[in-house]
Regions:
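Helix-loop-helix "hinge/cap" segment bordering the ligand-binding cleft or interdomain interface
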Residues: 3-114, 165-171
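Short catalytic/ligand-binding loop motif for oxyanion handling, primarily in non-cytosolic enzymes
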Residues: 28, 35-37, 75-77, 127, ...
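Extracytoplasmic/periplasmic substrate-binding proteins
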Residues: 101-171
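Short amphipathic alpha-helical coupling segments at ligand-binding clamshell hinges
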Residues: 168-180
């Protein structure tokens, strides 16, 4: 319902539509980010195409990819899911069997990656926010993010703006949001007043602005092939999410689960954690 207040032509509609609007407040994304893995393409002779499926990506022939995905899957475990909780229904969006399967696959993947001991010739793990690191020499890279279980990619909201709808001046609050998301503010040009400009050259501390031209500007130093890859990845972002306590819960589960010595102990940790989650959702 809030989309009608904004100029969608200048904003990343997919990111903005992930906002939260209820009877009490409106929370709208301002910046977002996701991790990218970049390899010099000529260093990946075994791969002609990077899979968009998480399990297939983890099993690709190229050892460098197996290793980096294995290492990062522990750090970004929560991103292998999209949303995991339905807050309205107070239920998990994945079955216990699905969660356990991903746990087992991730533990096995991390174990395999540690055993590879492969020398990774990658440009590095970069975030969308640090995209310029891939530019300079116009090197052609193979660039990809970590897919989630649905086969798309997850973007995380890194900064958001919000208003309380029960304020004494709700119309002014909405007008403030409209101003904040205007091209004048997001582009850095500022708003022209009588003898000065206000809200000019605003810089966000983290993430990429929801303003479409911001990402285009950041990509200018990249090779044409790299720019094309980034644009394709942007189109394949299927989930946009706010960070939550469930990120920590998922990563904690993985850490405890893989620390167990046998399957019986793993099963005990898993059942105990799921039960704790169910109780937490009902509060």
């Amino acid at each position: 319902p809030y989309m009608k207040y904004f100029d969608i032509d200048i904003l990343e509609e997919k990111i903005l539509s992930a906002g939260v609007a209820n009877e009490e407040q409106i929370l709208l994304p301002m910046t977002y980010d996701y991790f990218l893995y970049a390899f010099t393409t000529q260093d990946l002779p075994e791969n002609t195409k990077i899979s968009r499926n998480w399990l297939e990506l983890a099993r690709q022939k190229e050892k460098a990819i197996q290793q980096i995905v294995g290492q990062r899957s522990g750090i970004q475990f929560f991103n292998t899911f999209s949303e995991i909780v339905d807050y309205k229904k107070k239920t998990l969006l994945y079955s216990e069997e699905q969660i356990k399967k991903v746990l087992d696959e991730t533990v096995a993947l991390k174990t395999r990656s540690l055993a590879l001991n492969w020398e990774i010739k990658d440009t590095g793990v970069v975030s969308l926010n640090d995209l310029e690191e891939l530019g300079g020499e116009k090197t052609v890279h193979t660039v990809f993010p970590m897919p989630n279980q649905e086969g798309g990619f997850t973007a995380n909201v890194t900064l958001y703006a919000g208003i309380n709808k029960n304020t004494k001046q709700p119309l002014k609050a909405v007008s403030f949001l409209q101003m904040l998301y205007s091209e004048e503010v997001l582009s850095g040009k500022g708003i022209a007043l009588e003898d000065r400009r206000e809200a000019s050259n605003i810089r966000f501390p983290q993430g990429v602005s929801i303003y479409k031209k911001e990402l285009e500007k950041r990509m200018r130093s990249l090779s044409r092939q790299d720019q094309k890859q980034i644009k394709t990845i942007q189109e394949e972002v299927k989930t946009v999410r706010f960070y939550s306590v469930w990120d920590r819960e998922l990563n904690s589960l993985l850490s405890k689960y893989e620390a167990q010595e046998d399957e019986k102990q793993k099963e005990h940790v898993f059942i105990k954690t799921i039960q704790k989650w169910k109780e937490k959702m009902q509060k």
